[in-house]
Amino acid sequence: QSETVERYIKDGKVKPDLSIPFGDKRMFHYFREESIRNIAKQYGGDLITPQNMADKFMKFIETMDMSYSYKPVLLKAIYEYMDSSGRVALPDVVDYFIDFYEDRKAHGMIAEKSTSIYQKGGYTRKDVEKNILSNPFKRFEDMRFLMRCKDVETIEVNPIIFRKLTREDWLHIVDVCDKSLEKYYLRLKK
């Protein structure tokens, strides 16, 4: 994950092979393939490759940590609206999020933690989009499981993963998401 690498660089745990300044405060860091393997080995990381990407995606879903309910809601939105290439229009995902959380509130249930825009209310579609892209989507994007095309406002399941997943895999993903949401909301009630 990019945040972890940035933190390791800042803490002096990892040294890039090349760093190029970008603007006043940012740097692009580059690593040789051998360096990446060594860093992963040193810190117990496991590289995501085209060969293991679909398996890593499924494992990530099975074991996903949840500070908020956003990851499973995003996956369910993707399943609901994706086309035959694994693409979904971002406005459809925004609609799904709004419908999901507003439906919970309409049925007298907690939408989310009190700090969440969905619990507070008064949010705009732009607020929801920003929330989706900064919270659940970014984590999937950092691992290269999902991609975003800004020009046409779509989110796409990485084609390497999408080609390997069957309908049964997607039904399993939705089932895992439903169970994760159920556990999350039980925990939130306490």
State each model region's role.
Residues Q1-K190:
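Intrinsically disordered, charged low-complexity linkers and terminal tails
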